[in-house]
């Protein structure tokens, strides 16, 4: 159409010239005729350029103008910038409505950020992830981590953990939505240059598919807004970030569940999952597979007062054992399976100036209670790396936790993680059956906020734990850690923002080691380490 308009314009412009040439042909010389033709051609080219420019402006998306700074003489301050051109603030997009041209412009303005989000939503694919990686060295050879779950993470972890999630929307019509989700996680070694998965001599390089499930909305008439999922997935995890373990964690081989179901003032999460375990005999040389199932139920986001919410949770794990498996437990020395449960509540308070604090109370029995008594990592597992063993006799354990962060004025922030635990008549990995324990661990991390991108601070950690075995013998484990750090950040929050690049110097000391006999290199009870670590999520 554009080319046809140009040709028509050219013919109309040439027509008067042709008529004039015919009427004056007899009185003009050849030179005069050529001069008139050249003049008409120049005028035609000028008109064509004018129409072309107008058409280009009409169909090219406009950008929002930016002001140009000038110097005292009125010239642009930097007419030839060395950096690349700045992005436009907005773009024009064409409206799809049929009557858009009648009501106004057929184009509307949209910021680049909104346009990018629109494209992602239209495609329906997202790629999210997390990883950490860094360099470190210590005063006596290779640096070692110790009691991260009690002393804190800064300057005390040398792993390269990662989580990568792929999510694709496959249907979104008529009030119904379907997404396919896959999560890959694992660890990449930070000691040797090679990191082949399966070459696991150092226990570092491994990978797994931790999630592979379908999640939907709109298929359940009684809960159209809830997320209904089926596949390899567990209930949502709740982490004490500074200690790198979870207060709520239900691992799953496969399951079915419902999340964010609005009931009354709050929301319900419920999951029924399978997690088979390896049941060992007393020599820890032979094992048998036992089929277990977990019901995890939570009532969350219950409003209490301004910026405060409550969650109530319960979890029960039972086994579906065969006759031969029970016979092995009765007659062949295999450990008896004992059902286990955990119940509790948590309160989250958000602050006016930013930050939050979360308080939780949990009580458990048998194998979950046993994991309350671990000082290195205390997530509420039913097993130890999938292995089930120990004489569980109905003992219980209690755990109180606090974690959060708070701003103090405009230039200070402090994060905390404090845990108090005790248990009676539990099975301990270190002191055996019928053990009692009591422990307290505390980590605080104050920092000075230079600006949005820089913080300088210290992380202080201390813990002490005492176990008492069936014969009333006492075993003590304790230590402390001091880490000086400077971080490059993209936001001021310590617990809810990443990227974070840390430069640190750490002194860590084991005061007592009667539970694990741990030592650093050269049988030292202390270690000084320096390093740099990057941690990011997206």
Swiss-Prot record:
Membrane topology classification: Multi-pass membrane protein
UniProt xrefs under PANTHER family: CRYPTIC OUTER MEMBRANE PORIN BGLH-RELATED
Chief localization: membrane
Classification via Pfam families: LamB (PF02264), Sugarporin_N (PF11471)
Coiled coil feature spans: none
InterPro entries: G_neg_Bact_CarbUptk_Porin (IPR050286), LamB-type_porin_N_dom (IPR021570), Porin_LamB (IPR003192), Porin_LamB_sf (IPR036998)
Family that this chain belongs to: Belongs to the porin LamB (TC 1.B.3) family.
Extent of Polar residues compositional bias: 62-73
A Gene Ontology molecular function term of the record: carbohydrate transmembrane transporter activity
Gene Ontology biological process terms from the UniProt entry: monoatomic ion transport; polysaccharide transport
Membrane in keyword set: yes
CDD domains: Maltoporin-like
Disordered: annotated segments: 52-82
Species name: Shigella flexneri
Location of this chain's protein in the cell: Cell outer membrane
Classification via Gene3D superfamilies: Porin, LamB type (2.40.170.10)
Name of the protein this chain belongs to: Putative outer membrane porin BglH
Coiled coil keyword on record: no
GO cellular component, one term: cell outer membrane
Residues in the signal sequence: 1-25
Function: May be a sugar porin with a broad carbohydrate specificity.
Keywords on record: Cell outer membrane, Ion transport, Membrane, Porin, Signal, Transmembrane, Transmembrane beta strand, Transport
């Amino acid at each position: 159409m554009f080319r046809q308009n140009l040709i028509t314009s050219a013919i109309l412009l040439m027509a008067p010239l042709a008529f004039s040439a015919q009427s004056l042909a007899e009185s003009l010389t050849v030179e005069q005729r050529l001069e008139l033709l050249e003049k008409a051609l120049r005028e035609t080219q000028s008109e064509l350029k004018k129409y072309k420019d107008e058409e280009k402006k009409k169909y090219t998306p406009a950008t929002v103008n930016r002001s140009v700074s000038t110097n005292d003489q009125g010239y642009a301050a930097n007419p030839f910038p060395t950096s690349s051109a700045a992005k436009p603030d907005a773009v024009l997009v064409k409206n799809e409505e049929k009557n858009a041209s009648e009501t106004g412009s057929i184009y509307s303005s949209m910021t680049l950020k909104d346009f990018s989000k629109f494209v992602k939503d239209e495609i329906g694919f997202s790629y999210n992830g997390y990883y950490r990686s860094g360099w470190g060295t210590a005063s006596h050879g290779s640096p070692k981590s110790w009691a991260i779950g009690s002393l804190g993470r800064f300057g005390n972890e040398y792993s390269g953990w990662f989580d990568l999630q792929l999510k694709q929307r496959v249907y979104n019509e008529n009030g119904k939505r379907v997404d396919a989700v896959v999560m890959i996680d694992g660890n990449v070694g930070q000691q040797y240059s090679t990191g082949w998965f399966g070459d696991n001599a150092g226990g570092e390089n491994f990978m797994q598919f931790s999630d592979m499930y379908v999640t939907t909305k709109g298929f359940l008439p009684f809960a159209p807004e809830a997320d209904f999922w089926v596949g390899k997935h567990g209930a949502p995890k709740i982490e004490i970030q500074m200690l790198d373990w979870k207060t709520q964690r239900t691992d799953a081989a496969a399951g079915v569940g419902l999340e964010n179901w609005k009931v009354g003032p709050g929301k319900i999460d419920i999951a029924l999952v399978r997690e088979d375990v390896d049941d060992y005999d007393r020599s820890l040389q032979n094992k048998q597979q036992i089929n277990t199932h977990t019901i995890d139920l939570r009532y969350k986001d219950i409003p209490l007062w301004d910026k405060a919410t409550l969650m109530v949770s319960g979890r029960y794990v039972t086994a579906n054992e065969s006759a031969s498996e029970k016979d092995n437990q009765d007659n062949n020395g295999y450990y008896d399976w004992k059902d286990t449960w955990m119940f509790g509540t948590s309160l989250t308070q958000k602050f006016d100036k930013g930050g939050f604090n979360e308080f939780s109370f949990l009580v458990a029995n048998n194998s979950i209670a046993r994991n309350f008594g671990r000082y290195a990592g205390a997530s509420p597992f039913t097993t130890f790396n999938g292995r089930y063993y120990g004489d569980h006799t109905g003992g219980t354990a209690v755990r109180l936790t606090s974690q959060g962060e708070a701003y103090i004025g405009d230039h200070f922030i402090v994060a905390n993680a404090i845990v108090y635990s005790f248990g009676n008549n539990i099975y301990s990995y270190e002191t055996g059956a019928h053990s009692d324990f009591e422990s307290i661990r505390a980590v605080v991390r104050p920092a000075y906020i230079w600006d949005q991108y820089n913080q300088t601070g210290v992380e202080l950690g201390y813990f002490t734990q005492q176990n008492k075995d069936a014969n009333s013998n006492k075993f003590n484990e304790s230590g402390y850690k001091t880490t000086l750090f400077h971080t490059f950040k993209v936001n001021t929050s310590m617990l809810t923002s990443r990227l974070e690049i840390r430069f640190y110097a750490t002194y860590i000391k084991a005061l007592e080691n009667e539970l694990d006999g741990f030592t650093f290199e050269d049988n030292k009870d202390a270690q000084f380490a320096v390093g740099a670590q990057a941690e990011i999520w997206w």
